[in-house]
A protein has these predicted regions:
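N-terminal basic, low-complexity leaders that serve as flexible interaction/assembly modules and, when applicable
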Residues: 1-73, 359-372
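Metal- or metallocofactor-binding catalytic centers and their adjacent structured scaffolds
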Residues: 7, 43-121
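Active-site mouth loops of central-metabolism enzymes
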Residues: 136-152, 195-200, 243, 247
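N-terminal small/glycine-rich loop or linker at the start of catalytic domains
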Residues: 97, 122-145, 177-182, 186-190
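Conserved, mostly hydrophobic/aromatic
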Residues: 4, 47, 71, 110, ...
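Catalytic core of soluble alpha/beta enzymes
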Residues: 170, 175-302, 329, 337
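Catalytic domains of carbohydrate-active enzymes, especially glycoside hydrolases
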Residues: 159-168
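Flexible C-terminal active-site loop/helix
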Residues: 2-5, 9-12, 16-19, 32, ...
């Protein structure tokens, strides 16, 4: 039995530049200046290290606490090979902590790290271990929110196009900003609208009606609460393709979203829903519904690598979301916001090799639980 010898959490807060005015995606993030990641490193008795990432951002303290205080003490000394058994035996007894939120984010990190280890033992990059053939991916640029500043929107859309991006996502919430982006690109370019759950169903329908003939590629999470699938289905009737899924975690809810015909694009997040194991089940489940799986990926740590490998393992080419920002230091060689292409090499596992010489100074906290 290959045992888990140690689990370390590393919380990093990495400063970035947006290329425009700073506005958070939500009211609690008025001026977003740093992107937090909660990484997990699992060491095993065969001398390997596996990496995973829990959803961070404003949720980082909660994800970190669950890893350090609950999951790590329960897992150290256990078998690292039986991935499904490890996660299932934790998810059920801990369900009192919720079926979403920090518990699932923390489990996502653990699960991903265990898959990293499994692929390393098979001497395969994760995407090949999952059945993929090509490690070449097309990315799409995911812009920050510029507070409705139409000049900043147009300038950054044009800048993204200059790097080769043909699909660009906004995080604005106003129609003038939407149109500024649409007018800054060619007809065959795709503009996506991620509005982060700001509207009622009636408000979202009104917006969708107004922009329905303007060729936007999708409207993402237009209503609150995000799990109101019947409401999403109503908005979808206005003719704009609907995307959602980053705030769904259970298979039951993913199935309900598709059965309700609420969405066109399903966007599960590997750092939120339960890691590689749950993502594989979601992708398989979606095959029998008329939806396209496009994983959410607004992060830069091992979760970025995991999403890339999952995208490369899909039968249908899947674009990789990449935050269109400039970090204070290069976190690792795979993250490049100035290129619309990414190629995974043949390094076994995730291939996550962080630039710790530069990242060390941005570590907020770290903790480790080891076998006695």
């Amino acid at each position: 039995m290959t045992k888990i010898q140690g689990i370390r959490s590393i919380r990093v807060s990495l400063p970035f530049e947006t290329g425009g005015p700073r506005h958070g995606m939500r009211p609690s993030l008025d001026a977003w200046t740093k992107m937090e990641s909660v990484m997990v490193r699992i060491k095993t008795s065969d001398g390997l290290e596996g990496w995973g990432e829990a959803f961070g951002h404003a949720m980082a303290p909660g994800s970190e606490a669950v890893i350090n205080q609950i999951l790590a003490p329960m897992l150290v000394g256990r078998d690292s090979v039986a991935i499904n058994h490890r996660i299932a035996e934790l998810e059920r007894p801990l369900h009192g902590l919720g079926r979403s939120g920090p518990l699932m984010y923390a489990l996502s990190a653990i699960d991903t790290a265990l898959w990293d280890l499994a692929a390393q033992r098979a001497h395969l990059p994760l995407y090949k271990f999952l059945g993929g053939e090509s490690g070449v991916l097309t990315k799409y640029a995911s812009l920050m929110r510029y507070g409705g500043d139409t000049d900043a929107v147009a300038q950054n859309v044009e800048r993204a196009r200059s790097y080769g991006f043909k699909t660009i996502k906004l995080h604005e919430t106003t129609i003038p900003a939407f149109r500024a982006a649409r007018n800054a690109v060619e007809l065959d370019d795709k503009i996506c609208l991620d509005v982060n759950c700001p509207w009622t169903v009636a408000e979202a329908r009104e917006v969708a009606q107004e922009i329905s003939e303007e060729g936007f590629h999708w409207l993402e999470e237009p209503i609150w609460p995000p799990e109101d699938f019947e409401g999403l289905a109503e908005v979808r009737l206005e003719g704009v393709p609907i995307s959602a899924g980053e705030n769904i975690t259970t298979l039951h809810e993913f199935k309900l979203a598709m059965e309700t015909e609420a969405i066109d694009n399903l966007q599960p997040s590997v750092t939120k829903c339960g890691g590689i194991s749950k993502m594989r089940k979601i992708i398989s489940l979606a095959e029998v519904y008329p939806v396209t799986v496009i994983p959410h990926c607004f992060y830069w740590g091992p979760g970025y690598h995991a999403t890339a490998h999952l995208a490369a393992s899909c039968l249908i080419p899947t674009p990789l979301e990449t935050a269109f920002i400039t970090f204070a230091v290069e976190p690792h060689k795979l993250f490049d916001s100035c290129s619309d292409q990414l190629t995974l090499d043949d390094t076994p596992g995730l291939g996550f090799i962080a630039n710790w010489d530069e990242l060390d100074k941005f570590i907020i906290s770290t903790d480790e639980v080891n076998a006695s």
